Amino acid sequence: MRNDSPYTPLLNASHNNHRRRELLLLFSGLLLLASIIAFSAYIAQPHADADVSSSSSILSDEATRPTTLSRGVSSGVSEKSNTFLLSGNLVGEGGSFPWNNTMLSWQRTAFHFQPEKNWMNDPNGPLYYKGWYHFFYQYNPNGAVWGDIVWGHAVSRDLIHWLHLPLAMVADQWYDSNGVWTGSATILPDGQVIMLYTGSTNEFVQVQNLAYPADLNDPLLVDWIKYPSNPVLVPPPGILPKDFRDPTTAWLTTEGKWRITIGSKINKTGVALVYDTVDFKTYERKDMLLNAVPGTGMWECVDFFPVSMKSENGLDTSFTGDEVKHVMKVSLDDDRHDYYALGTYDEKKVKFIADDFENDVGIGLRYDYGIFYASKTFYDQKKDRRVLWGWIGESDSEYADVAKGWASVQSIPRIVKLDKKTGSNLLQWPVAEVESLRLRSDEFQNLKVKPGAVVSVDIETATQLDIVAEFEIDKEALEKTAQSNVEYECNTSGGASRRGALGPFGLYVLADNGLSEYTPVYFYVVKGINGKLHTSFCSDQSRSSLANDVHKQIYGSVVPVLEGEKLSLRILVDHSIVESFAQGGRTCITSRVYPTRAIYGAARLFLFNNAIETNVTASLKVWQMNSAFIRPYHPDQKRQTS
């Protein structure tokens, strides 16, 4: 395929996108400063409960509250606004909630990655290079809403503490003037770093571009060069101009060529296009599609990588062998969830074949059953593992995001590997480095929780926690409980307050003393007609906040529990984000919650058992979590980086 493109820049194309929101940026900055002052004054005072009236409302005037706008779709990407609030819905009545600076300041996380301010979305091009983990991300330098997208850049020694570097790539060429969109990194055997990314042209056509470091001797990779003959790929015949995006990390074929896949759709069928290259400048499109699944719509942020069937270690993207399965993951534009399938990769036929066609990509398994999208993995050659990043969006109003001056966080990086016990799903678990933030711990063994009981867990504070817990149902109750053919689904179940014979039971996180606000993370067990137990793992946001301009959903799915296993979970609580992992990471749920009372020193932790027919025995260990050091990089630090 030729390097030159039929798309040329408009003669009078404007490159002033970065100045469109100067007034918004100024407004956001002033509010952020006010938030910091209010927060400092608040935490300086001892308090047992949060006083929602301690700071005057900044969002109480409904007449001045702007309407939530659709963002992203007209430009050719998935909806970036809260679709529930976009439709005009409010949870409850009475207009928007009177948020104040105390509440909004509390929402900012302490150990999840996020920029100092403004909007962030997809993780891009993560890699490990010369002693540093690099993380790039979709970023709006001009405001707390989607738009004016460039690449932010940060580096870390341990995936926990981060230094913000200058922007890696900005929208300064005709082929990316409407956005430097998502891309992936490939490290070649000679050490060269290749970055392929999607650019939105001056005519909103999606094209693929090549960039590379200006100085490979710089471990921070601060400066990047865009290939002078970009774009290297344009939409092929039969693919619409706005349906061609997000190139993957390349993998090496047995012929010595590099292969990538790019997400698209043909009518309503999601597809993964395949290209081969030897130099990342010219490409050969393969006739076969890597995969295609009818009815799944546009595929964004495709990821493709091997996992070992024997070893616990991660594998380089180019690794092949008999004892390997391949993972294909897509982000569905239609519902904004990340789906994956396990299967076999046939290099000669250029085909991924799912192990279970009924659970092919976009149909069955998901990385995460909460708010988790546009994820991307990379092979960490330092620790021989595959690491997963995911974008955690907001579920509050856009107006509240503008008021607090930022929107979105990234998940805690997760190790991804095949579940050797089931062979049919992945395991995801926070990287071990997050445990370096653990402080004081409290341990509770064999706590008996009776049906209908709520038990306070006596810990110091409950805003930044790492919780590990196990639960057991009484064996006698299991034997007596009647069999049922009723299937349980978390999102239509009625939540943690709806009682059944063997559930729900678990933990209330971010709860206040009076339980006017709480977020349950729980198990629900059903005894099937064959006598087998079917377990669901859920997270219920319906009572997480008194605010009515927040989308409060119930998330979750089934979780495999093997014979002899106790029910186990791990929860990371970090202010407004709750990441939950069941059975070693077989099922994961990420939630965004926005309490108005259960904040700062007023946040509590409870055990609960809403089962009707069984006692539950719980054992748990709870760590207070330190804050990560996430701060700007200063040039004086450069001499310390080699």
UniProtKB/Swiss-Prot annotation:
Stretches that traverse the bilayer: 23-43
EC number: 3.2.1.26
Annotated propeptide span(s): 1-95
Lumenal side: 44-642
Membrane topology recorded in Swiss-Prot or TrEMBL: Single-pass type II membrane protein
Pathway: Glycan biosynthesis; sucrose metabolism
This protein's GO CC annotations: membrane; vacuolar lumen
InterPro entries: Beta-fructofuranosidase_N, ConA-like_dom_sf, Fructan_Metab_Enzymes, Glyco_hydro_32, Glyco_hydro_32_AS, Glyco_hydro_32_C, Glyco_hydro_32_N, Glyco_hydro_beta-prop_sf
Glycosylation sites: N100, N267, N491, N615
Keyword Acetylation found: no
Tagged with keyword Iron-sulfur: no
Catalysed reactions listed for this entry: Hydrolysis of terminal non-reducing beta-D-fructofuranoside residues in beta-D-fructofuranosides
Quaternary structure and partners: May be present in two forms, a 70 kDa monomer and a heterodimer of the 30 kDa and 38 kDa subunits. The ratio of the levels of the two forms within cells appears to be regulated developmentally.
Family: Belongs to the glycosyl hydrolase 32 family.
Identification of the protein by name: Acid beta-fructofuranosidase
High-level lineage: Eukaryota, Viridiplantae, Streptophyta, Embryophyta, Tracheophyta
